[in-house]
């Protein structure tokens, strides 16, 4: 007797009075199938002895599958799809609020992983169970949406993006802190728009913030994109950054400032088409435009790093080459070096008996500083060794002891 290798599906809905043609009706039914590691179970034998093993089946782990009667073909067991979690408005607004409140910290930290963990913790306190990575990815997506809305809708993105205004406010606040007026070169570009653009940046490689490419940069501590740090820098992802969250127009990430920057010629996705270098001083990193004159570049650097004295400074590249400040300087990463000045010790004497009263250490950075010091003391020069008068700063010897001469 020949028995088919394939077991036919049993129609539990079929009446005894129905004609056999009803078997062609397409229905779906749910049946329980034993979950077992033995793939060689004889399905036909199982069919004949099903009623003997009914109680055993109930005690075993089971899984439900959906079978159709429309054909005699074997049916696949398909795992149910997991619905992607969506962010409700309250969650998104809370994320933006927390990110905005910590924006200043993103500008000074090389790794933002701990900052996203704090944001995640605050989200949980408000009843939103979102991990640091989920928060990072959502933030990057918001930045990407903002950039798309801004540049494709000519700045009128608020109509198509729910949180356009909130993101724009964060970027505007950042630009006010670090962007000097000289950056606005084009008369056709609104000041606010120019400032915001200078901090927007996308990265094709992905931000580990996820993006920025919008990747997971911030969440895992690696550079990702940054509206954060350069609109949070990864070349192209949005990262908002003052030092900056951020990946800049040349693709430099503030968190990983040694990353090779772009050449400035890539016009795809780059909100700022000028020449930009990345300058690092201590724990701070700034992206500086070098399209102006040498004097303008110096003033921008002084303003960006808060240099309020007249001490000299220079930029040194990764090959320890000191570069001239001009619009033709090579694009790349630079270290900001400050002049240590000239330190000497000055003794003050009692004019009546010529005995030393006290001494002080003075540091001069410019000839003008030296002249002002002499004028305040009422001296014409400084004297060393009791006979040599020094009238010019260049003749001073570091560490030497001097006295004033009227």
From Swiss-Prot:
Q: Which residues carry this modification: Phosphothreonine?
A: 133
Example GO molecular function term? sequence-specific DNA binding
Q: From which domain of life does this come?
A: Eukaryota
Q: Under the cellular component aspect of Gene Ontology, which terms does the record hold?
A: nucleus
Tell me which residues make up the Myb-like domain. 79-143
Q: SMART domains from the entry?
A: SANT
Q: Where is the composition biased (Basic and acidic residues)?
A: 1-19
PTM annotation, UniProt: Phosphorylated on Thr-133 and Ser-198. Phosphorylation is calcium-dependent and increases DNA-binding activity 10 to 20-fold.
Q: Where does it mainly reside?
A: nucleus
Recite the UniProt keywords alphabetically: DNA-binding, Nucleus, Phosphoprotein, Transcription, Transcription regulation
Q: Does the keyword Acetylation apply?
A: no
What, per the annotation, is the impact of changing residue 89 to P? Answer: Decreases strongly DNA-binding activity
A biological process from GO? regulation of DNA-templated transcription
- Report the function annotation for this chain: Probable transcription factor that binds specifically to the core DNA sequence 5'-GGTTAA-3'. May act as a molecular switch in response to light signals.
- Name of this chain's protein: Trihelix transcription factor GT-1
Q: Which organism is it from?
A: Arabidopsis thaliana
Gene name linked to the record: GT-1
């Amino acid at each position: 007797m020949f028995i088919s290798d394939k077991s036919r599906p049993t129609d539990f809905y079929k009446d005894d009075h129905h004609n056999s043609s009803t078997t062609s009706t397409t229905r779906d039914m749910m049946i329980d199938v034993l979950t077992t590691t033995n793939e060689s179970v004889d399905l036909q034998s199982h069919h004949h002895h099903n009623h003997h093993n009914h109680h055993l089946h109930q005690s075993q782990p089971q899984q439900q599958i959906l079978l159709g009667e429309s054909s005699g073909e074997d049916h696949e067991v398909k795992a149910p799809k997991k619905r992607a979690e969506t962010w409700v408005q309250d969650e998104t607004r809370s994320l933006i609020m927390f990110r905005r409140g910590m924006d200043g910290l993103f500008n000074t930290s090389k790794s933002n992983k701990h900052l996203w963990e704090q944001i995640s913790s605050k989200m949980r306190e408000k009843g939103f169970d979102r991990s640091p990575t989920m928060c990072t990815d959502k933030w990057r997506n918001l930045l990407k949406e903002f950039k798309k809305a801004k540049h494709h809708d000519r700045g009128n993105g608020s109509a198509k993006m729910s949180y356009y205004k909130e993101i724009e406010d964060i970027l505007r606040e950042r630009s006010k802190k670090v962007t000097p007026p000289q950056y606005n070169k084009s008369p056709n570009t609104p000041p606010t728009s120019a400032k915001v653009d200078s901090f927007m940046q996308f990265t094709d490689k992905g931000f580990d913030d996820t993006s920025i490419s919008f990747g997971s940069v911030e969440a895992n501590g690696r550079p990702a994109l940054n509206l954060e740090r350069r609109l949070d820098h990864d070349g192209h992802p949005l990262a908002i950054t003052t030092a900056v969250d951020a990946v800049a127009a040349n693709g430099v990430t503030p968190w990983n400032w040694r990353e090779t920057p772009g050449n400035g010629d890539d016009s795809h996705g780059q909100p700022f088409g000028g020449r930009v270098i990345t300058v690092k001083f201590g724990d701070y990193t700034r992206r500086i435009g070098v399209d102006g004159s040498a004097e303008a570049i110096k003033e921008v650097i002084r303003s960006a790093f808060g240099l309020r004295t007249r001490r000299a400074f220079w930029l040194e590249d990764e090959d320890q080459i000191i570069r001239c400040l001009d619009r033709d300087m090579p694009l790349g990463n630079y270290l900001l070096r400050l002049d240590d000045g000239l330190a000497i010790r000055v003794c003050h004497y009692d004019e009546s008996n010529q005995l030393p009263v006290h001494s002080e250490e003075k540091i001069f950075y410019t000839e003008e500083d030296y002249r002002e010091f002499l004028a305040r003391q009422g001296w014409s020069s400084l004297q060393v060794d009791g006979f040599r008068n020094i009238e010019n700063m260049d003749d001073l010897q570091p560490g030497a002891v001097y006295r004033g001469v009227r």
